[in-house]
Amino acid sequence: MSKRDVKAFLYDILESANDVIEFTKDIDYNEFINNKMIRYAVIRALEIIGEASRYINNDFREKFPNVPWKEMVGLRNILIHKYFGIDYILLWKIVKEDVPKIKKEVEIV
């Protein structure tokens, strides 16, 4: 387990969520899918969100049930272990719909 403070992990989640939103704010799905650099940057930011979530202890997570902790860790696992099978349509939906919600919920924490 990491010796970093929970606040540091929450900061990582917020910073990475902000990055995802910034990287994709002025583009549509076609530009996302055709721009390898943006795809890689978004995937890396989502991996960081999941990795940071993984290190937040269960007692803390239980205090904030509106944050999808397990789903964030699960997405990280999919992105890292099944890279060649990524569903980019689903990933785009996560970027546009779920990441802003995650950001909002983590800001409340």
Swiss-Prot record:
Annotated positions of the O-di-AMP-tyrosine modification: 83
UniProt keyword Transferase present: no
Sample GO molecular function, one term: RNA nuclease activity
Cross-referenced Pfam families: HepT-like
Oligomer status and interactors: Homodimer, probably forms a complex with cognate antitoxin MJ1379.
Function: Probable toxic component of a putative type VII toxin-antitoxin (TA) system, probably an RNase. Probably neutralized by cognate antitoxin MJ1379. Neutralization may be due to AMPylation by antitoxin MJ1379.
Family statement drawn from the similarity comment of this UniProt entry: Belongs to the HepT RNase toxin family.
Identification of the protein by name: Putative RNase MJ1380
